[in-house]
Every structure is written in structure tokens, then in C-alpha cells.
């Protein structure tokens, strides 16, 4: 597509401007760089890979461990007129085969997959036929043995890079400097490109209350708050 990143953002998402650091991440990806983005939850990580993927030919492979999020994002993209697919653990072999066939030979922009899928022979067979624009790694801290949520299946992404000549966009909301270095090494970054924002959330306030009856205090707070919340 012959649109700028900002024009693409406006066309498909309706936003007039990027959030802090989003445009830096998008531009780095468009320059064919491997990039690790550390953004807080709610920081707009999806836009950071969806915009550049819409500006490049081919299909972006999005690796995510969260099936519910996978389905929500595919539905959201389809609602915007962007063709997207997903392969998850709840699908039978025939449905998986059909989905991967469509990803390889159809006109789709995004394929969401779980990390467990990457090592299967069927996936590896079809991925060789795909014109892959980007490899997107969501929850990228899961690839690091130094991270709090290490998942061995994420190590398959390194093998995927042997089959696909495409830059990596890795995203996480949490990574220490040690974990960030480990992520970039395990994903085979050609150059270190780390972009991160601060984690201050101006829409949140913090209150510390000293009390003896913690349960009673909690019940009082819950009874005074209307709507939903997290305890």
C-alpha cells in the first residue's frame, strides 16, 4: 500500500496520531530492522505491528500464547475489513489444514498462531509457501529463561527464522535489561534495536491505607465502588 504510516493508522484505525514511541517502532520495522518494544499494558502494542504489516506485501505471522486475545484480535481486524486468520488448539486437523492453506495461498494479512504450533510438520510445510512480511512475537518475555513466565515452545521461533526471511517485531509489557538482552539473542536479532516507554500510568492513582482489619477495609471499599474492579 502506498500510504504513510500515519495515513494507514487513520485509514484503518481512525486515529489522527500515534501514541509515544509507536511511530518509532513502526518506522524501525519498516526499515527491515528486528525490534523489541517494551510498552505498558494498554500502551497500544497491536498498532506497532499491525500498521507496518498493512504497509508491506505478504502476511504477518503473529505468535501469541493467549487464545482468547488471538480470537479477539482476529475478529477486530476482520471488523475493520482486514483479512486475518488464527490457528488454535481447539481446531481439528482438517480445519487447521484449511486455515494454513488459506494463509499460504489466499489474500490474508495476518495469521495468529500459538507457539506450540510452530514446531509441527504441517505448519512448517505451509510456512515455506507463505510470503511472510513480519514475524511478530507477543508476550516476548516468554522466550527468556530469565523471565517469570518462560515457555519452551517459544524457542521454536528461532527455528522459524531459518525458514522465513522476515524481520521480527517482539513485544512485551515487562522485561528487565537482562531479559531484554536474552530476548534479542534468542530471537536472533541482527542488530540490537530496543524501544521502550516509561511505565507511569497517568490514569491511575495509588493510595496506601494503614489498618488493622484488612478484610473489613476491603469490604468497605468494595461496597462503595460502583461497577467492576480487580482485587
Label each PLM-derived region with a short phrase.
Residues 31-37, 58-59, 107-109, 166, ...:
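Pre-Walker A (Motif I) flank of P-loop NTPase domains
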Residues 43, 50, 91-134, 143-148:
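Conserved helix/coil segment N-terminal to the catalytic DExD/H
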Residues 1-40:
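Conserved pre-motif I regulatory segment
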Residues 128-137, 141-197, 215, 219:
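Post-DEXD/H (motif II) to motif III coupling segment of the RecA-like Helicase ATP-binding lobe
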Residues 32-51, 61-64:
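Walker A/P-loop
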Residues 71-105, 182, 186-187:
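Conserved helix-turn-beta segment of the N-terminal RecA-like "Helicase ATP-binding" lobe
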Residues 60-70, 224-231:
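Conserved strand-helix element at the start of the C-terminal RecA-like helicase core
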Residues 205-231:
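Conserved interdomain hinge at the start of the Helicase C-terminal
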Amino acid at each position: 500500500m502506498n500510504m504513510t504510516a500515519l495515513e494507514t493508522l487513520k485509514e484503518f484505525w481512525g486515529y489522527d496520531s500515534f501514541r509515544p514511541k509507536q511511530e518509532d517502532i513502526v518506522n524501525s520495522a519498516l526499515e527491515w530492522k528486528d525490534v523489541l518494544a517494551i510498552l505498558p499494558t494498554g500502551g497500544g502494542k497491536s498498532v506497532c505491528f499491525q500498521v507496518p504489516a498493512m504497509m508491506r506485501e505478504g502476511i504477518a505471522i503473529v505468535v501469541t500464547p493467549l487464545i482468547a486475545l488471538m480470537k479477539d484480535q482476529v475478529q477486530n481486524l476482520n471488523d475493520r475489513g482486514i483479512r486475518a486468520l488464527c490457528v488454535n488448539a481447539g481446531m481439528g486437523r482438517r480445519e487447521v489444514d484449511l486455515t494454513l492453506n488459506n494463509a499460504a495461498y489466499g489474500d490474508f494479512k495476518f495469521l495468529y498462531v500459538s507457539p506450540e504450533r510452530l514446531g509441527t510438520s504441517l505448519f512448517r510445510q505451509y510456512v515455506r509457501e507463505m510470503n511472510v512480511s513480519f514475524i511478530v512475537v507477543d508476550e516476548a518475555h516468554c522466550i527468556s529463561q530469565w523471565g517469570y513466565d518462560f515457555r519452551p515452545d517459544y524457542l521454536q521461533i528461532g527455528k522459524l527464522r531459518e525458514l522465513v526471511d522476515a524481520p521480527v517485531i517482539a513485544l512485551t509489557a515487562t522485561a528487565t535489561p537482562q531479559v531484554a538482552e536474552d530476548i534479542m539473542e534468542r530471537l536472533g536479532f541482527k542488530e540490537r534495536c530496543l524501544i521502550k516507554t516509561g511505565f507511569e500510568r497517568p490514569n491511575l492513582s495509588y493510595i496506601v491505607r494503614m489498618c488493622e482489619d484488612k478484610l473489613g477495609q476491603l469490604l468497605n471499599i468494595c461496597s462503595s465502588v460502583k461497577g467492576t474492579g480487580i482485587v
